[in-house]
Amino acid sequence: MDTVSAFKLEVRADKIAVITIDAPGEKMNTLKAEFGSQVRGLIRQLRDDKSVRGVVFISAKADNFIAGADINMIARCRSAQEAEALARQGQQIMAEIHGLSIPVIAAIHGACLGGGLELALACHGRICSDDEKTRLGLPEVQLGLLPGSGGTQRLPRLIGVSTALDMMLTGKQLRPRQALKAGLVDEVVPQAILLQAAVELALKGRPTSREVPVRERVLAGPLGRHLLFQFVGKQTQRKTQGNYPAVKRILQVVENGLAHGCSSGYAEEARAFGELAMSPQSQALRSIFFASTDLKKDPGAEAGPGSLRSVAVLGGGLMGGGIAYVTACKGGLPVRIKDIQPRGINHALKYSWDLLNKQVRQRRLRPVERDRQMALISGTTDYQGFAHRDVVIEAVFEDLALKQRMVSEVEQYGGPQTIFASNTSSLPIGDIAAHASRPGQVIGLHFFSPVEKMPLVEMIPHKGTDPQTIATVVQLAKRQGKTPIVVADKAGFYVNRILAPYINEAMRLLVEGEPIEVIDNALVKFGFPVGPIQLLDEVGIDTGTKIIPVLESAFGERFSPPANIIDAILKDDRKGRKNNRGFYLYETKGRKSKKRPDPAVYPLLGIGRPQSRLSAQQVAERCVMMMLNEAARCFDEQIIRSARDGDIGAVFGIGFPPFLGGPFRYMDTIGAGEVAAILQRLAAQFGPRFTPCDTLLRMAEQGTTFWPADERLT
């Protein structure tokens, strides 16, 4: 049976050929290997039909042009040569599109990313819709790759090298007006007239080459290019610590093409694509992509979700304000905030207003849209209107009696359908539900701060939580733009439990005399976005350490921090960035906030003159191995449902280095035997807290892995 083509060609009366892209049976258009022959067939038709005056590519999908290449194509490659051949095939198809003698225009609505933008770049002109869904970018670097179908050569020549590098090295996506300003598109029009505008552009003949700004022309010259690549190279090295080889290869490939011409650039691009596709960093980053994609489809429970029409939030503090914002502004759901004080409600409303107003100032949101979203959020000091709320999210103080009272009151004033979701970070959900009349509708929903930025939520059912409750709250989290993982109702849940030993070990290194910045820099070099001590400052020392006694009580001495260190810091009123003094001092100059280690911390903790005695590798090893050992325990105790969930939880929740794929993929890469051996060596040097858990010893003996063998390469 013939495969249904994703490309349909129709020639209009005005002799403009419209190629409609519609991948059969798919919500998103993604470029697949078999599409190559389909496009080539259309190009042959266009060459043969001399009456055709121009071509327009447009998508039949509701919200995407082409969202990129099908990543599974790369996963199926077993060598750099296979991946290089894949890139060359893409380059050849784009060259054939660009080589047509008649004007070819891309009419873009929705996501135009990766291979989709490379196809648009191969066209002679581009028009996009002014819709909020329209985004243009080359995000391959986020998968440890580079654009492999000509993007590294065409983009710099179209918009200038510095702007192109910014897009490719960061994966930044441009909105319609940004794309127009950059010269990436020729026009921005309402979606309703997108096709007509593209046809009119095609009828005018090939668009004339856009003049690149003077600054970009200077940077494209030999001297300017040398200085630019030298500067950007140093900047990216500082940001990536050399952990992401794709950024270095992007710089090399772009520079090669500018210095030696497109032919050399295309050859180098394909070669680099092949190398990067086989790199462990890209394989790890692609595993994160596949895992997060799987989680988006995971309903969380076998039951179907209940209705989800409106939500309430208890508490107008930092977390409550953030939860209200993502519920209304990301999820589009009406939210009512309850606080005992009007100022708490006002604080939460201001939180959303400030975030929305910032988007208005940045021209990412129209004032009328800001006002519409704000209208979804209301406040109350009583339970008026709670009978109609499907989910009530509690974000009050970490006090068990208070949370139990909240459950009782919500059951009294809410409807029979109302779910109670607690944002606790430390209290057992079973205890919170202990006196509930409808315990099946009580669940934990642990957000991370700041709520609007952190992508993860932990979903914590207790033993009596109904499957429908789980499914409903998972659906809510997805509407809020979050990635939910379901974790067991045990002390610390998952993320805080693996984070605490890591933080504690950093504190021990500090007490031993390692300077604050040396510890943090070592973990940044390892691949974390910030070091453990700075992380504590960012979260808030008072907030971040509340979980430690809970974990110490549940699991014993291995969770004990160095004696009195936290008490001494808190008694000196050091809370971190929020009061401008923690382990670091913070000062704001203009729009920039600067931090520096506070030397007064050392005498406060009874530390003499700090002096670095360990290498960055030794510092990182001690902190990371404590985290890995605890993650293995969580896996064994079924705190997480799978290695997939554990990796996503660590990467999205605490910034575990994505290029390592998460703690479980990292342990699989180096081997359970090696992890156990390192822990045994550290235990002999520093004490029994490093003793490898039984799970690691058993896996080392059996030669098994956390990830199933058939999932390790996807």
Curated annotation (Swiss-Prot):
It is found in: Cytoplasm. Its main location: cytoplasm. InterPro entries: 3-OHacyl-CoA_DH_CS, 3-OHacyl-CoA_DH_NAD-bd, 3HC_DH_C, 6-PGluconate_DH-like_C_sf, ClpP/crotonase-like_dom_sf, Enoyl-CoA_hydra/iso, FA_oxidation_alpha_subunit, FadJ. Its EC number is 4.2.1.17, 5.1.2.3, 1.1.1.35. It comes from Klebsiella pneumoniae subsp. pneumoniae (strain ATCC 700721 / MGH 78578). Residues 1-190 are annotated as: Enoyl-CoA hydratase. PANTHER family: TRIFUNCTIONAL ENZYME SUBUNIT ALPHA, TRIFUNCTIONAL ENZYME SUBUNIT ALPHA, MITOCHONDRIAL. This is Fatty acid oxidation complex subunit alpha. One of its GO terms (biological process) is fatty acid beta-oxidation. The gene is fadJ. Catalyzes the formation of a hydroxyacyl-CoA by addition of water on enoyl-CoA. Also exhibits 3-hydroxyacyl-CoA epimerase and 3-hydroxyacyl-CoA dehydrogenase activities. The keyword NAD applies. CDD domains: crotonase-like.
